[in-house]
Curated annotation (Swiss-Prot):
Lineage: Eukaryota, Metazoa, Spiralia, Lophotrochozoa, Mollusca
Tissue: Nacreous layer of shell.
Domain of life assignment: Eukaryota
Protein name: Uncharacterized protein IMPP17
Length: 14
């Protein structure tokens, strides 16, 4: 599965 989290720049990384 893909974990969603916010990158240091505020981007949503999947």
């Amino acid at each position: 599965y893909y974990e969603e989290y916010v990158d240091g720049q505020g981007m949503v990384v999947r």
